[in-house]
Design a protein with these regions (language model features):
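C-terminal peripheral helix-coil segments that are non-catalytic and often amphipathic
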Residues: 1-4, 91, 95, 136, ...
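Basic, helix-initiating cap at the start of DNA-binding domains
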Residues: 1-44, 51-58
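Hydrophobic/aromatic residues within well-ordered alpha-helical segments
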Residues: 13, 56, 67-68, 89-92, ...
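Amphipathic alpha-helical linker/stalk segments
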Residues: 63-92, 98-100, 104, 108, ...
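Helical hydrophobic small-molecule/effector-binding pocket
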Residues: 86-118, 122, 167-171, 201
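Amphipathic alpha-helical packing segments from all-alpha helical-bundle domains
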Residues: 87, 98, 107, 111-113, ...
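Membrane-interface starts of transmembrane alpha-helices
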Residues: 152, 156-160
Length: 205
């Protein structure tokens, strides 16, 4: 299955199908789910479902792409980027951690890792729609802030990656190994404050 070679037709019930599929993948995971379950959850016929998506893999990829696009837009597009870097980066970190610790974010990450050998396209879709887009958006902000004299950065891609890794400190390893999946606001605040202060200690002016 190659998503790039699969024509996805949109129609009147397209969003309805995606919503049903999202619920099924969250509840059942990838391996246990099937197109019958998706059709039932979406309230559409199997014929309608297959008119949009030829297989479960293509459907999963579009569900991931749609949700990740929404999350990545919220991560930077809804933030006042004219504010001080500490404020902008703090808000960006909060959005990143919000997605990382969400039920959807955790479940999709685990599915993509579990299916990586059989369906590498799933992991690629998750990466390209989520982490890569956020990296590009943060990198664009860092470039603009540097041009405005608010930051001092020469390698914007590296700096964006470093900021992302700082936001994952302590939280991501716990999620990865299933040690902890629910986090208190104070735990997230600690990571956010540490990420921003460490980043600005390196790149602030």
């Amino acid at each position: 299955m190659n998503i790039e070679n699969t024509a996805i037709r949109k129609g009147r019930k397209f969003d309805q199908v995606l919503a049903g599929a999202r619920d099924v993948f969250l509840a059942e995971g990838f391996s246990a789910s099937n197109m019958d379950h998706v059709a039932k959850a979406a309230g559409v016929s199997k014929a309608t479902l297959y008119s949009y998506f030829p297989d479960k893999e293509s459907l999963f990829i579009v569900v991931v792409q749609t949700e990740c696009a929404r999350q990545s837009d919220e991560a930077m597009e809804h933030i006042d980027q004219s504010a001080a870097p500490a404020v902008v980066l703090g808000n960006a970190a909060r959005h990143l951690l919000g997605f990382m610790t969400s039920e959807f974010g955790q479940r999709m990450f685990r599915i993509c890792v579990a299916q990586a050998d059989r369906f590498p396209e799933l992991g690629l879709a998750f990466y390209q729609s989520g982490p890569m887009v956020v990296r590009e958006k943060i990198g664009a902000y860092l470039r603009g802030a540097t041009q405005e004299g608010q930051l001092h950065i020469t390698d914007f891609d590296l700096a964006a990656d470093q900021f992302g890794e700082l936001c994952k400190a302590d939280i991501f390893p716990k999620i990865l190994f299933g040690v902890q999946t629910v986090f208190e606001p104070s735990e997230l605040d600690r990571i956010i404050d540490g990420a921003v202060s460490t980043f600005l200690a390196k790149y602030g002016v």
